[in-house]
Amino acid sequence: MIDVNNFEYMKIGLASPDKIRSWSYGEVKKPETINYRTLKPEKDGLFCERIFGPQKDWECHCGKYKRVRYKGVVCDRCGVEVTRAKVRRERMGHIELAAPVSHIWYFKGIPSRMGLVLDMSPRALEEVIYFASYVVTESGDTPLDKKQLLSEKEYRAYRDRYGSTFQAAMGAEAIKKLLQDIDLDKEVDFLKEELKTAQGQRRTRAIKRLEVLEAFRNSGNEPSWMILDVLPVIPPELRPMVQLDGGRFATSDLNDLYRRVINRNNRLKRLLDLGAPSIIVQNEKRMLQEAVDALIDNGRRGRPVTGPGNRPLKSLSHMLKGKQGRFRQNLLGKRVDYSGRSVIVVGPNLKMYQCGLPKEMALELFKPFVMKELVEKGLAHNIKSAKRKIERVQPEVWDVLESVIKEHPVLLNRAPTLHRLGIQAFEPTLVEGRAIRLHPLVCTAYNADFDGDQMAVHVPLSSEAQAEARLLMLAAQNILNPKDGKPVVTPSQDMVLGNYYLTLEREGAIGEGMVFKDANEALLAYQNGYVHLHTRVAVAASAVNNVTFTEEQKNMLLLTTVGKLIFNEILPESFPYINEPTNSNLEKETPAKYFVEKGANIKEIIASREEVAPFSKKILGNIIAEVFKRFKITETSRMLDRMKNLGFKYSTKAGITVGVSDILVLGEKDEILHEAQAKVDNVIKQFRRGLITEEERYDRVISIWSNAKDVIQGKLMKSLNKRNPIFMMSDSGARGNASNFTQLAGMRGLMANPSGRIIELPIKSSFREGLTVLEYFISTHGARKGLADTALKTADSGYLTRRLVDVAQDVIVREDDCGTDRGLLIGAIKEGNEVIESLYDRLVGRFARKTVKHPETGEVLVAENQLITEDIAHIVENSGVETVNIRSAFTCNTRHGVCKKCYGRNLATGTDVEVGEAVGIIAAQSIGEPGTQLTMRTFHTGGVAGDDITQGLPRIQEIFEARNPKGQAVISEIDGVIAAINDVKDRQEVVVQGEVEARTYAIPYGARLKVIPGQKISHGKELTEGSIDPKELLKVTDITAVQEYLLREVQKVYRMQGVEIGDKHVEVMVRQMLRKVRVSDAGETDVLPGTLLDIHQFTDANAKVLLQGKQPATARPVLLGITKASLETDSFLSAASFQETTRVLTDAAIKGKRDELLGLKENVIIGKLVPAGTGMNRYRKVDLVKTTQDDMNVENDEVYVEQ
């Protein structure tokens, strides 16, 4: 038996008239829909039961046969087959057209496919199809040319002169005749000959024609099928008609469009039967053509057909297009059952892997499970009574629910789901009330807060789904962020504040210098008020019992505070005792200075020492990362829960809060402002005397006020008390920063106006003093712009993510090693002298391509193909090695994906990447998710021309779309020396002297030079400041240079904003942009010149001819923007569901494309499991095998084996 859900590929093509008739179950002859009295479908109408099947299950139209027992009987009275009503979703009908009609997609699309096949202009085609001109179909022995257009007048004149020796016609029939006459093989050979000599426009046109003709020749589609003789009618359930309350009917627009076609078709038939004058018939044929056009794609040509209220009707094409179309609304975004949503509230007492589910919601979600359990426990006799029990919410239901829920994880999702941490699994616990309880530590990953956010719950049903949820998606498993491999579950806000307060030290606190035998005694003293949390005390080191203490240290006393003793209890046993916030203390051991001999004068020693800084958010993050590195997941999540509990407990005990008295206004503020004002007055004087320009005046005023604000900020921070609650909040990283504080107590500073230009009147007051009316008005500008920007940015960033996902969705780890011999040479990324990304950051988690040796000793630091761990990376960086050759996605040879070695470590787990990991989507999410944090504005540095560098989100879009950048830099095309810089008129020219030739470059007005005479320069390097156009760079250099440039630019933008992203994510995206080549010369292969091919397809075609000793093709690499690259993908399903649906489908149909279903989207669309992760073939072919007792050394009944 054929399995409908298991197929290997999907093919699309043109349908021949016979094919359309074979799909059909009958001809629709009347435009009627349903009878207004009986509300039953009219016979032969658009909803006819005889054609499309019965409206009610197992019941014919006239009611003679009812019930299942007549299954398959065709009623002898009404002719309706007795079957299920759902066949009305799949049975098609057809309309026999009285005159052929052109299909608007193939005639009107760009480029016009019909025009290319016939070598006629779209304008000429339009005149013929819509009956404005005649076209000569057979020239006979007249001086007329075939395909020549004739007006009505000319046609009559020629008819009179030549009689019937030539033939000319109008309408789609004429075009059909021309299409049937075409000899594809002859045309193709002719064009190939022409290509050898043609240049310019003729060559381009020939290439386009050749592509379309080859497509027809290879796909088995007939060109004449672009003209319709028969029109398919889609099943009635897909264009339903429903009765509204009030007796009126609502119907799909398609029914109106079909009715117009049928009406005009019937009228045309009648006119032809009557033998009406040709002008009337022609008019009717034109109207039929327009009706069919409107049905297929309303609005593509002329004015769209409108319904009531002047609303354009939705045609078949509109059903597919856009966010609400079939692809994105129903195929890629399905609604699921077993789901619910509710408001979230915090659940501080939950474990890391738990969430609280409201009782009513849980009962509804797990209803079938509860029903089954009720029957099994004998609490209900059958399923029906079990259901009744649940609906009446009888008390025994709750106990059963508890037991059902116990081992059954649920998925929680918060929209917008920007990265894979937006859906995680939890074990539910039942809670009262109607709100979902969420663990506070997972808020960062979800970007959730409790101000009314809602979340959705989903229940994984099958045992495989539950296992995946538990093993891969449980919140306790997702500790690292896939974008940079840093922990994403760092404590925030109250938790940070509590731990900060707990680890504070205070000089002269109560009980300073007391000595305790162990932590418990210190705790007892604290509880009884003898010491404070912040008191510096000594404890016997042996009682702390830390593995990292030496034998000698164990006999000494450890200097610490009561708070730190409490804090260290949450850490794993073999972890160093953390006494100061330094990396050496975290990674190695407690510094020796904290140990003193027994019998020493503790008080004196303590009094002579500085206070040690408390642990801020950053340190807590480092502790978590270090614990994760050493102890993996379970221990980390346990420690996180303890850290959370401590934080909440001690932030409550601390009672830290903000009062007006905590904000002290700086005394020296007035002096600073007076000074600044004097400077500004001076600048204005200079401007009035004409010594400086308006631009300079503006720049100087802005910089004077900015400096004044910085001075005030600096002094404020110095004058602050370390115990000031606001300072503690900002210093610990819980909330707020220096700038907030400056605005509260110093001055608000400069504000931007809505266009982004800075207003030169500063706000001199702080919030504590209160703003004047004018100052308040100015500050509303800035605030409003901030909100508007954020809203725009979110949409922009979401669209960027969508494009990124689309271009990389089929990049999956496919194999262990691709065996490439190429690598990528990397060093630190620098901008000037500032290191943007260090060599260490770039090395960790990658495989070395070549052996790395110590530059001085020559000792081998990393062997070839060895994984570079954190420790090795430190060693390499400290050894003074500048560049390392590593395996990279750029140079990976794997088709449709990457291999394990080239990708390196999976950042989300800290282990090797698994085969099947969908690294393309992870890369897209990692780049897209921080998009919202990037600034929106294009910086205008003082408004000097040529200095407009785009930054932030617009720059990222510019890079990934491979657009010409703003403020483009001029680059050198040759290696050489800057021979001279000449002034020509009001511009400059740079002369580069190479070994063979000299090149002169005109520098655009206002651009700033980056070079000086005598300087050496290599090809592809900038002569002026600004961004390089990557397409230009590709012409001058090679792929590697472009890859490195794009990677560097992306990292620059993100790192400047303080966002870290792993290189490998950018590499995956850039690789997708550079995977195509454009054929320049076809050689003796069968590829066409000028076409875009995948690099692998190109090498295959060449390998084939080289084996036969023929001439291979040549090609140039092409850089495509991500949108273009998505549309150029081999999968038409993926491209059609992305953008430009009609164009993609038109093209695919003519070429008779096969979609091999390699990517994720294609498989989601057709409803198969995605071929990534556990859905990969190699993991699907796993069987359960029962073994005999003899072979069993394990207790399990089954073992998994791979076929």
Curated annotation (Swiss-Prot):
Reactions this protein catalyses: RNA(n) + a ribonucleoside 5'-triphosphate = RNA(n+1) + diphosphate
Co-factor requirement: Mg(2+); Zn(2+)
Note on how the cofactor is bound: Binds 1 Mg(2+) ion per subunit.
InterPro entries associated with the record: DNA-dir_RpoC_beta_prime (IPR045867), DNA-dir_RpoC_beta_prime_bact (IPR012754), RNA_pol_asu (IPR000722), RNA_pol_N (IPR006592), RNA_pol_Rpb1_1 (IPR007080), RNA_pol_Rpb1_3 (IPR007066), RNA_pol_Rpb1_3_sf (IPR042102), RNA_pol_Rpb1_4 (IPR007083)
Binding site for Zn(2+) 2: C818, C892, C899, C902
Entry's Gene Ontology cellular component terms: DNA-directed RNA polymerase complex
GO MF, one example: DNA-directed RNA polymerase activity
Listed EC numbers: 2.7.7.6
Record's protein name: DNA-directed RNA polymerase subunit beta'
Gene transcribed to yield this protein: rpoC
